[in-house]
Amino acid sequence: MLVPTEAPASIREMVTAAAARYASHPAIRAAGFSPRNWNAYFHSMIQVESGFKVTAYSSAGAMGLAQLMPGTARFLGVDPRDPVQNLDGGARYLLMQLGAFGTPELALAAYNAGPGAVRKYRGIPPYRETRNHVRKVMAIYRNRLT
């Protein structure tokens, strides 16, 4: 997980555009997010996932800004190497988790560890990486709102 403090303007614009495409999604309202909060939340997740690096590649095989796994990208019908499609897939997948689990923290845990792990543990799994991921994203998110 990379966490630089700022993204290049072109990347910020792509992340903002991806978030804006889904600003009226029912899961956003159900979680209590305004469009501004959703945008800050999505930016924060991308910051932690990839450090805003289009070419980010994890040892597990996750790719791009939203760090999509190949199987998830196929499921979503996106090319994970294309930054616009990667972000679109990441936004949709995060919204699926938000809709399924109802809270920002559980959605992040499901995005990181998989929805099966969140169901199995009935909450954030006890994996250090996942707990750190959720903590980092939420801290950056809260900071973006101030």
Please report, for each region that a protein language model flagged, where it lies by residue.
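Catalytic glycan-binding domains that act on GlcNAc-containing polysaccharides
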Residues: 1-146
